[in-house]
């Protein structure tokens, strides 16, 4: 089961990257990997997606295109879009 506290703490090292771009830190990429490892079922993916979306909404200056590029920059195949605008039920 995925809870948002876990997702938030996994993504917290990514906040400077998400707000400013550049290169994500190793800790940030470890967090992205951790979310991937938790997201093994459709329900888990949807829950993680909702947590990510809620977290993203707390940062009005978050750059959506930077957020969406995060899994690629970390070389993690994440099946969850990192965005404020995702329809999580469509996953």
Swiss-Prot record:
One function term, GO molecular function aspect: lipid binding
- Can the keyword Magnesium be found in this entry's annotation? no
Q: Respond yes or no to whether keyword Disulfide bond is given for this record.
A: yes
Give the residue range of the signal peptide. Answer: none
Which SUPFAM superfamilies has this protein been placed in?
A: Bifunctional inhibitor/lipid-transfer protein/seed storage 2S albumin
Record's Gene3D superfamilies? Plant lipid-transfer and hydrophobic proteins
Q: Which UniProt keywords apply?
A: Disulfide bond, Lipid-binding, Transport
**Matching Pfam families, A to Z?**
Tryp_alpha_amyl (PF00234)
Q: GO biological process annotations for this chain's record?
A: lipid transport
> Which family does the record claim for this protein?
Belongs to the plant LTP family.
The further comment given in this record reads:
Displays antioxidant and antiproliferative activity. Exhibits antiproliferative activity towards the breast cancer cell lines MDA-MB-231 (IC(50)= 52.93 uM) and MCF-7 (IC(50)= 44.76 uM).
What is the role of this chain?
Plant non-specific lipid-transfer proteins transfer phospholipids as well as galactolipids across membranes. May play a role in wax or cutin deposition in the cell walls of expanding epidermal cells and certain secretory tissues.
UniProt name for this protein:
Non-specific lipid-transfer protein 1
